[in-house]
């Protein structure tokens, strides 16, 4: 864990300016993976060169795929699924939950042996939700806690299609099963309890694969091949979220965000902001590769408390840390529930959000499935820690902009996982 400490101070004036947020992390991962599995050359622009997505590139290079990456441009020379070769060493996913879970789906259908590892945080995250259904499909997967924890050993091969009902909504699990189903005999169908982000389905379609959706059931026929496609990655709404919240709560602010992804399965934060009374406008909307994008402007707003629950949770699961910061600045009680999934992110985000914001004087309490925030009380300075979780780190930086006193943030290095230019962009608005 990066021990670097940064001293943060209250914003002296309103935030003002224009930011092009980095490429969407979810889409960047998938563009590289699908390009590596496809026949032909895939060109990716707008790629997020953060640590997580670079882990995906490294893993596929180890399986013999030629990938060139310079800044936000990536070229992948795919030779089809059969072009993937048995790796010589272990596949290290670093801190990336997306990489490991989707990779397990790919590896399950490949006729070779592989071992997947990650960092300490990955070593604590549950993998049985992916490995159990993949085993049902015929993959041989072993690991600590009977395949629940890394390192994981996968001996793939001919898998069979299944009909699987997911107990917990997870786009990563859904995607892993669809990628395994692509290689299986027959039609695999996955039913989710709540609709989750659908980047995998949209991008498979762009790569020439037929995926059908009926209600909350997604089906894929095995034996289809991917054809290379060029991918233009929109800006990541999860990264934009930090500046959307900052623009709302720092007095005298007006912030423009360009080229932000507006996929409805990810845009829950926009609905919450509108509901709460934010001065938010969205324009210049276009769609490329099945992914909508647009420009947005946010200014300081008088906001009302809000409730987040049920079907809305998967559409903003990664934005809850910064929405909790927003809630501390709104008079009244904000409630977040049905968000148990936060417990299995890079940290237990219920505990870390509540624990760290409480250190800054927030009136906030954890519940079994979320949190209750009684806002409107000024935040104070204090010592806080990202716990190696990029989204916690950035949320605490936004909190510091409103704190009456300096905030000392430990483990800032984690932020580079998804937003390497975060501090540079924040500085440009001040």
Swiss-Prot record:
One of its GO terms (cellular component) is cytoplasm. GO terms for molecular function: 3-phosphoshikimate 1-carboxyvinyltransferase activity. It is found in: Cytoplasm. 3-phosphoshikimate binds at residues 25-26, 30, 170, 172, 318, 345. It comes from the Bacteria. Its EC number is 2.5.1.19. InterPro entries: Enolpyruvate_Tfrase_dom (IPR001986), Enolpyruvate_Tfrase_sf (IPR036968), EPSP_synthase (IPR006264), EPSP_synthase_CS (IPR023193), RNA3'P_cycl/enolpyr_Trfase_a/b (IPR013792). It catalyses: 3-phosphoshikimate + phosphoenolpyruvate = 5-O-(1-carboxyvinyl)-3-phosphoshikimate + phosphate. Pathway: Metabolic intermediate biosynthesis; chorismate biosynthesis; chorismate from D-erythrose 4-phosphate and phosphoenolpyruvate: step 6/7. Phosphoenolpyruvate binds at residues 25, 97, 125, 172, 349, 391. Transmembrane segments: none annotated. One of its GO terms (biological process) is aromatic amino acid family biosynthetic process. SUPFAM superfamilies: EPT/RTPC-like. It holds the Pfam family EPSP_synthase. It is an enzyme of class 2 (transferase). Keywords: Amino-acid biosynthesis, Aromatic amino acid biosynthesis, Cytoplasm, Transferase. Catalyzes the transfer of the enolpyruvyl moiety of phosphoenolpyruvate (PEP) to the 5-hydroxyl of shikimate-3-phosphate (S3P) to produce enolpyruvyl shikimate-3-phosphate and inorganic phosphate. NCBIfam families: aroA. Belongs to the EPSP synthase family. HAMAP family: EPSP_synth (MF_00210). Monomer. This is 3-phosphoshikimate 1-carboxyvinyltransferase. It comes from Shouchella clausii (strain KSM-K16). The gene is aroA.
């Amino acid at each position: 864990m990066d021990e670097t400490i940064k001293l943060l101070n209250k914003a002296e004036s309103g935030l003002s300016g224009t930011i092009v947020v980095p490429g969407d992390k979810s889409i960047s991962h998938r563009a590289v993976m699908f390009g590596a599995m496809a026949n032909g050359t895939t060109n990716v622009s707008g790629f997020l060169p953060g640590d997580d997505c670079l882990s995906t590139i490294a893993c596929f290079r180890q399986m013999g795929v030629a990938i060139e990456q310079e800044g936000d441009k990536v070229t992948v020379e795919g030779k089809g699924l059969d072009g993937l070769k048995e790796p010589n060493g272990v596949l290290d996913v670093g801190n990336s939950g997306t990489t490991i879970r989707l990779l397990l789906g790919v590896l399950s259908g490949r006729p070779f042996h592989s071992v997947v590892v990650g960092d300490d945080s990955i070593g604590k995250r549950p993998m049985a939700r992916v490995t159990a259904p993949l085993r049902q499909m015929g993959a041989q997967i072993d690991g600590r806690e009977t395949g629940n924890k890394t390192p994981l050993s996968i001996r793939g091969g001919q898998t069979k299609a299944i009909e699987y009902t997911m107990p917990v909504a997870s786009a990563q699990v859904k995607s892993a099963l669809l990628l395994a189903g692509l290689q299986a005999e027959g039609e695999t169908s996955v039913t989710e309890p709540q609709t989750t982000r659908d980047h995998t389905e949209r991008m498979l379609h762009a790569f020439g694969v037929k995926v059908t959706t009926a209600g909350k059931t997604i089906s894929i026929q095995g034996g289809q091949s991917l054809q290379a496609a060029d991918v233009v990655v929109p800006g990541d709404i999860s990264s934009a979220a930090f500046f959307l919240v900052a623009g709302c709560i720092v007095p005298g602010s007006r912030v423009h965000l360009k080229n932000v992804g507006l996929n409805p399965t990810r845009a829950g934060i926009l609905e919450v902001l509108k509901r709460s009374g934010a001065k938010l406008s969205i324009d210049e909307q276009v769609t490329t590769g099945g992914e909508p994008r647009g420009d947005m402007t946010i200014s300081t707003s008088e906001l009302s408390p809000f409730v987040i629950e049920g079907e809305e949770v998967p559409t903003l699961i990664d934005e809850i840390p910064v929405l909790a910061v927003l809630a501390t600045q709104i008079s009244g009680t904000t409630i977040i529930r049905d968000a148990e999934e936060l417990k299995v992110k890079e940290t237990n985000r219920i505990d870390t959000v509540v624990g760290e914001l409480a250190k800054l004087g927030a009136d906030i309490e954890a519940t079994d499935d979320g949190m209750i925030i009684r806002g409107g009380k000024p935040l104070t300075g204090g010592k806080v820690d990202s716990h190696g979780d990029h989204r916690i780190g950035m949320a605490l930086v936004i909190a510091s902009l409103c704190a009456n006193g300096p905030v000392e943030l430990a483990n800032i290095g984690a932020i580079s996982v998804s937003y390497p230019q975060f501090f540079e962009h924040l500085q440009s608005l001040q």
